[in-house]
């Protein structure tokens, strides 16, 4: 029961502090919180890809068949690019494994 009383008193203290200092709560922006790690860069890339694909392409000016063809074209290009990247990474992996096997066994 004591913990609940402490929680309530801290909430009251926060409310009093907010009333004295104003009601605005500082929240850092995404740019301020960014650390520059790889997963943030990948997320930013896919976010920009989304904005380019769904927002900037003028589907609303096209007929439904034209927009369908353009949509299919971009999906095919993206899929083939992803396939090529995957094949390249796998070839590097198998080349490395083959080299390591040769270095370890000499055969």
Swiss-Prot record:
Q: How does it sit in the membrane?
A: Single-pass membrane protein
Cellular localisation: Endoplasmic reticulum membrane
Question: Which coarse location class applies to the principal site listed for this UniProt protein?
Answer: endoplasmic reticulum
Q: Name one GO biological process term.
A: 3-keto-sphinganine metabolic process
Its Gene Ontology cellular component terms are:
endoplasmic reticulum membrane; serine palmitoyltransferase complex
UniProt superkingdom: Eukaryota
Q: Could you state a single Gene Ontology molecular function term?
A: enzyme activator activity
Q: Where do transmembrane segments lie in this chain?
A: 72-92
Record flagged with keyword ATP-binding: no
Q: Which UniProt keywords apply?
A: Endoplasmic reticulum, Membrane, Transmembrane, Transmembrane helix
Its annotated function is as follows: Stimulates the activity of serine palmitoyltransferase (SPT).
The protein's name is Serine palmitoyltransferase-regulating protein TSC3
User: What is this protein's gene name?
Assistant: TSC3
């Amino acid at each position: 029961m004591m913990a609940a009383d402490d929680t309530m008193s801290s909430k009251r203290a926060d409310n009093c502090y907010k009333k004295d200092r104003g009601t605005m709560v500082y929240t850092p922006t995404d740019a301020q919180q960014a650390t520059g790690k790889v997963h943030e860069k990948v997320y930013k890339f896919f976010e920009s890809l989304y904005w380019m694909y769904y927002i900037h392409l003028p589907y609303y000016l096209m007929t439904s068949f034209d927009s369908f063809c353009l949509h299919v074209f971009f999906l095919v290009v993206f899929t083939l690019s992803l396939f090529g990247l995957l094949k390249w990474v796998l070839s590097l992996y198998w080349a490395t494994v083959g080299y390591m096997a040769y270095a370890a066994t000499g055969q």
